[in-house]
């Protein structure tokens, strides 16, 4: 019997589910899972999450002020959802540091440590957790210190090579370049309805980063994220990991035909690529020169921060905090 495209893809790439929805995770048997404030916000509106919220609320009452309580409530809720997900997958779950700490090295480190401590209280070791940090200069510095502590990092909101190199030099466990959001920007900028899959700017960006990392033997893994169609996903077959929403997992599951491996570390090693020197000045200048990466990074931080605030507001209203 012919394998569907999802099963074929699983043989060449680690498949990660991009959701906070526990029912969807049960359905697709991924290795890992990623969450973010936006996904948690949509998930907690479902009745199944009520006990996780109730438990987080009671836990947060040990905090001294209403500000500390809401912060602890949010962290505990993220960890509770993460623990439920970990019951269903063999691998790791990614839990995000508050996007409002994207330019705060110490704040990011402290938040990561407190999330890891909450997981430990639940009997989950840090090896099964990836801490998500925005791929700012400061995010990379925080990741460098966290990785030295044995806390593994997933660098998110990544749109450019300078961000990728900075994160790899920080020895982050993995990066999550956002394929679909790059496509969105170029479609609007170039005023076109779309691109052929191989010419998709998001696909080309991840492919270039993949070649660079494999050429120079960086240990940091690449997890393509934020897809707009299944063709983008198939163009990155062979990437270390791909994090895919339930909708596209279903499309791939229902699709037949041969999946060709597009990315191969051994082939990337043979390419003639010049190394790029990266320090803070070079990073900031290169990011500033890249209008797409600058705009998408800023927008991503704003949107994740906005959803964290919405979640806080919902919890404050529901539980009458402060």
Curated annotation (Swiss-Prot):
Top-level enzyme category: transferase
Gene it is expressed from: tal
CDD domains (UniProt xref): Transaldolase_TalAB
Assigned keywords, A-Z: Cytoplasm, Pentose shunt, Schiff base, Transferase
UniProt family annotation: Belongs to the transaldolase family. Type 1 subfamily.
Catalytic residues as annotated in Swiss-Prot or TrEMBL: 132
The protein's name: Transaldolase
InterPro entries per record: Aldolase_TIM (IPR013785), TAL/FSA (IPR001585), Transaldolase_1 (IPR004730), Transaldolase_AS (IPR018225)
Keyword Signal included in the entry's annotation: no
Subunit composition and interactions: Homodimer.
């Amino acid at each position: 019997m012919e394998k569907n495209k999802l099963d074929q893809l699983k043989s060449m790439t680690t498949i990660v589910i991009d959701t906070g929805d526990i029912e969807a995770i049960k359905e697709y048997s991924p290795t890992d899972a990623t969450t973010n404030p936006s996904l948690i916000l949509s998930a907690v509106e479902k009745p199944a999450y009520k006990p996780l919220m109730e438990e987080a609320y009671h836990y947060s009452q040990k905090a001294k002020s209403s500000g500390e309580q809401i912060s602890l409530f949010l962290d505990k809720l993220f960890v509770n959802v993460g623990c439920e997900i970990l019951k269903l997958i063999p691998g790791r779950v990614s839990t995000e540091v508050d996007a409002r700490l994207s330019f705060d090295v110490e704040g990011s480190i402290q938040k990561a440590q407190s999330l890891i401590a909450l997981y430990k209280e639940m009997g989950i070791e840090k090896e099964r957790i990836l801490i998500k940090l925005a791929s700012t200069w400061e995010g990379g510095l925080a990741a460098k210190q966290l990785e030295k502590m044995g806390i593994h990092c997933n660098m998110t909101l990544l749109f450019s090579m300078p961000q990728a190199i900075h994160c790899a030099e920080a020895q982050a466990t993995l990066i999550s370049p956002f394929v679909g959001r790059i496509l969105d920007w170029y479609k609007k900028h170039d005023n076109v309805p779309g691109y052929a899959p191989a010419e998709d700017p998001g696909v080309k960006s991840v492919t270039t980063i993949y070649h660079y990392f494999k050429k120079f033997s960086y240990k940091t893994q690449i997890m393509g994220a934020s897809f707009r169609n299944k063709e983008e996903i198939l163009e990155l077959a062979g990437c270390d990991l791909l994090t895919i929403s339930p909708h596209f997992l279903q499309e791939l599951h229902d699709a037949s035909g041969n999946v060709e491996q597009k990315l191969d570390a051994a082939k990337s090693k043979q390419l003639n690529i010049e190394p790029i020197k990266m320090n803070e000045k070079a990073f900031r200048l290169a990011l500033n020169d890249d209008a797409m990466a600058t705009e998408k990074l800023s927008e991503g931080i704003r949107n994740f921060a906005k959803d964290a605030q919405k979640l806080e507001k919902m919890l404050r209203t529901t539980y009458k905090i402060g």
